Amino acid sequence: MASMQKRLQKELLALQNEPPPGMTLNEKSVQNSITQWIVDMEGAPGTLYEGEKFQLLFKFSSRYPFDSPQVMFTGDNIPVHPHVYSNGHICLSILTEDWSPALSVQSVCLSIISMLSSCKEKRRPPDNSFYVRTCNKNPKKTKWWYHDDTC
């Protein structure tokens, strides 16, 4: 538990001092608990999401960094994207099976920025309605099927 807290403190400072472009730690979100953060995000310039504002929710288990954080979009504005479900769940392999303790909150943020920035068409995943109706609240409990860089 102490190593998890030490690691989160280090990552918290890194996110406060050197946030990825368009990302800001929501300071209020960490006042009560170091294991749940909200990161405010703005769509990158020159992309389909330019000027749009989103929020990412990070939840860390006591096994972090050996266990990936639970990461999902939250709030009123969930991006319309082929890998983002309308409930905020994100289909991104580094959030599950490709997670490594060498990754960090910053690297997850950069991957999500890159995923949104490379989008050519705003649309939901083809199985959005079914998935949202039947999924677990925790996206990490989903058995994602990654193929051809899509879900």
Curated annotation (Swiss-Prot):
Keywords: ATP-binding, DNA damage, DNA repair, Nucleotide-binding, Nucleus, Transferase, Ubl conjugation pathway. InterPro entries: Ub_conjugating_enzyme (IPR050113), UBQ-conjugat_E2_core (IPR000608), UBQ-conjugating_enzyme/RWD (IPR016135). One of its GO terms (cellular component) is nucleus. Disulfide bonds: none annotated. It is found in: Nucleus. Pathway: Protein modification; protein ubiquitination. It catalyses: S-ubiquitinyl-[E1 ubiquitin-activating enzyme]-L-cysteine + [E2 ubiquitin-conjugating enzyme]-L-cysteine = [E1 ubiquitin-activating enzyme]-L-cysteine + S-ubiquitinyl-[E2 ubiquitin-conjugating enzyme]-L-cysteine; S-ubiquitinyl-[E1 ubiquitin-activating enzyme]-L-cysteine + [acceptor protein]-N-terminal-amino acid = [E1 ubiquitin-activating enzyme]-L-cysteine + N-terminal-ubiquitinyl-[acceptor protein]. PROSITE patterns: UBC_2 (PS50127). One of its GO terms (biological process) is cellular response to misfolded protein. GO terms for molecular function: ATP binding; ubiquitin conjugating enzyme activity; ubiquitin-protein transferase activity. SMART domains: UBCc. The active site is at 91 (glycyl thioester intermediate). Its EC number is 2.3.2.23, 2.3.2.25. Belongs to the ubiquitin-conjugating enzyme family. Accepts ubiquitin from the E1 complex and catalyzes its covalent attachment to other proteins. Catalyzes monoubiquitination. Involved in degradation of misfolded chaperone substrate and DNA repair. This is Ubiquitin-conjugating enzyme E2 W. The gene is ube2w.
